[in-house]
Amino acid sequence: MIDKTAFIHPSSIVEEGAIIGAGVYIGPFCIVGSQVEIGAGTELKSHVVVNGITKIGCDNQIYQFASIGEANQDLKYAGEPTRVEVGDRNRIRESVTIHRGTTQGGGVTKVGCDNLLMVNTHVAHDCVIGNRCILANNAALGGHVEIDDYAIIGGMTAIHQFCVIGAHVMVGGCSGITQDVPPFVIAQGNHATPFGINIEGLKRRGFDKESLHAIRSAYKLLYRSGRTLDEVKPEIAELAEQYPVVKAFNDFFARSTRGIIR
């Protein structure tokens, strides 16, 4: 079903069965598959391919040569009907690739809302990207990676499969991430190590002095006390009772499967 207010350039192919919302713009030389749904106001600039069982929300801007919903690169994948879901108001720049999920990983690759995926970003099968994240040029996510809200991933950074990147994290460019990065932390290097708290980013997002102090205290316990994670977890949990913002650390530890960067 194609809304009557949608524009489709004559050189583009929209297969029968695709759902195209109001005010959608599909520019020259695009291909949209039969199981694709594109929400109102989304723009495909030109030469965009959207394939597979893919749902794209409203008011997204998708630039030249982006590929969304194509078969993933997992060698176990045998054509199962897995999906891609993209939220609203994302900017997906040139040559970005977002691959469909696998049955082993839940069957869906997800991108939230208000994200910026810069040129050549790769989002592999079963990744989950939150809201208001920035992935700079040539950032590459392995399968099953989770990127929490407001995280910034520097250009040319590679993230190993199954890693979790916490909320408000900043990862410097050309880094290699092989373990999980706790919330609020700056990480840099190959292999990445912690470089303090993302103070400027937190200030811009309205964190008050008390919250910043509490986050610093948790960071010092985690990285400067000379103790193991299991040893400091109870103290961080106590700190979270007084300062709710610190609870983000506890929630993160519960999700972490690869250990945290050191």
UniProtKB/Swiss-Prot annotation:
Q: Could you state one GO cellular component term attached to this entry?
A: membrane
Q: Does the keyword ATP-binding apply?
A: no
Q: Which UniProt keywords apply?
A: Acyltransferase, Cytoplasm, Lipid A biosynthesis, Lipid biosynthesis, Lipid metabolism, Repeat, Transferase
Localization (cell): Cytoplasm
Which GO molecular-function terms appear in the entry?
Answer: acyl-[acyl-carrier-protein]-UDP-N-acetylglucosamine O-acyltransferase activity
Is Transferase a UniProt keyword of this protein?
yes
What Enzyme Commission number(s) does the record list for this chain? 2.3.1.129
Which Pfam family name is an example for this entry?
Answer: Acetyltransf_11
Q: Which reaction does it catalyse?
A: a (3R)-hydroxyacyl-[ACP] + UDP-N-acetyl-alpha-D-glucosamine = a UDP-3-O-[(3R)-3-hydroxyacyl]-N-acetyl-alpha-D-glucosamine + holo-[ACP]
List the disulfide bonds in this chain.
none
Q: What is its main location?
A: cytoplasm
The EC category is transferase
What metabolic or biological pathway is this protein involved in? Glycolipid biosynthesis; lipid IV(A) biosynthesis; lipid IV(A) from (3R)-3-hydroxytetradecanoyl-[acyl-carrier-protein] and UDP-N-acetyl-alpha-D-glucosamine: step 1/6
Give the GO terms filed under biological process for this record: lipid A biosynthetic process
**PANTHER family given in the database record:** ACYL-[ACYL-CARRIER-PROTEIN]--UDP-N-ACETYLGLUCOSAMINE O-ACYLTRANSFERASE, ACYL-[ACYL-CARRIER-PROTEIN]--UDP-N-ACETYLGLUCOSAMINE O-ACYLTRANSFERASE, MITOCHONDRIAL-RELATED
The family assignment reads:
Belongs to the transferase hexapeptide repeat family. LpxA subfamily.
The record's note on quaternary structure and interaction partners says: Homotrimer.
Q: What does this protein do?
A: Involved in the biosynthesis of lipid A, a phosphorylated glycolipid that anchors the lipopolysaccharide to the outer membrane of the cell.
* Protein name in the entry: Acyl-[acyl-carrier-protein]--UDP-N-acetylglucosamine O-acyltransferase
What species does this protein belong to? Yersinia pestis
Per UniProt, what is the name of the gene that codes for the protein in this document? lpxA
